[in-house]
Amino acid sequence: MARVKYGKVTRARRKRWIKLAKGYFGTKKSSYKKAHEQVIRSMAYAFIGRKERKRDFRSLWIVRINAAVRPEGLSYSTFMHGLKLANININRKMLSELAINNSEEFKQIVQQAKKALNK
């Protein structure tokens, strides 16, 4: 049987990992072993980061809503409870956008929530 050499295949596979390590510092971008280890680690960090981003944005929206509601004399939690009682189903992302860009419309929503709380 003829001898099989995997030079081209191995080189192509290694080049793929080196390509993924583009922009890394030192030997992590050029040495296959270091690049492979760092790319695996980077992918793990990226996976975790995609989960954390959802949490971070939700907390940012909550902070923005709270900051917009405080001058109206409500806390975030009472405001959200008022929205629930008033049957207003707007998610936190949209509420924070309204608070930043359309403050008049947001104030109307706050008034409706206050009205529902007083009933």
Swiss-Prot record:
It comes from the Bacteria. Signal peptide: none annotated. SUPFAM superfamilies: Ribosomal protein L20. Gene3D superfamilies: 6.10.160.10, Ribosomal protein L20. It holds the Pfam family Ribosomal_L20. Binds directly to 23S ribosomal RNA and is necessary for the in vitro assembly process of the 50S ribosomal subunit. It is not involved in the protein synthesizing functions of that subunit. This is Large ribosomal subunit protein bL20.
